Amino acid sequence: FRPDVIFVTPSYILAILDEFRAQEVDPRQSSLKIAMCGAEPWTNAMRTEIEDSFDPHAIDNYGLSEIIGPGVSCECIESKDGPHIWEDHFYPEVIDPATGKVLPDGEFGELVFTTLTKEAMPIVRYRPRDLSRLLPGTARSMRRMEKVAGRSDDMMIVRGVNVFPSQIEEIILKDERLAPHFVIELRRAERLDQITVVVESRLDAES
């Protein structure tokens, strides 16, 4: 197989790049023409490394598992200036995360999506807690969303998986040897995110 397109998290395509180099294979021999990257934050520096090494177009793709997964919005290879939202299927809004007030296009706030064509499980004004703003269309007529700047809650995205501190706390509380006091250390090692949880032990805990 010689695929033209790969759909992947940016950290994994960089890990693939490292494997090419480890095996002394020129990544430019790959058949890839487009790398659709999403499910975790990535930077313009990461895009540049992907494009300079593999020689494909690296474009940003945004999705929500609660709505459709990947494909709520996608960058165009012509402009690469932010994902265009598929407004035929999703109605986007940006609100003030504190008050819920709808903000005009161009102002930063929390994204809100309503599905327009989903039949089995329509979703109305879903708040994914992602912070961005709506911008005019460029290469496509549909509006763009700026790259997500952060979140209005404390969720972490690790290798494309949503991780909440409350989930970690739930596991800790099941162990009677551990106190409910912990620190989460999130770092990137060799392209991939890693989590270390430092937990206090109870004074009366048996080793």
Where are these regions (language model features)?
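Active-site glycine/GP-rich loop and adjacent strand/helix microenvironment
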Residues: F1-S207
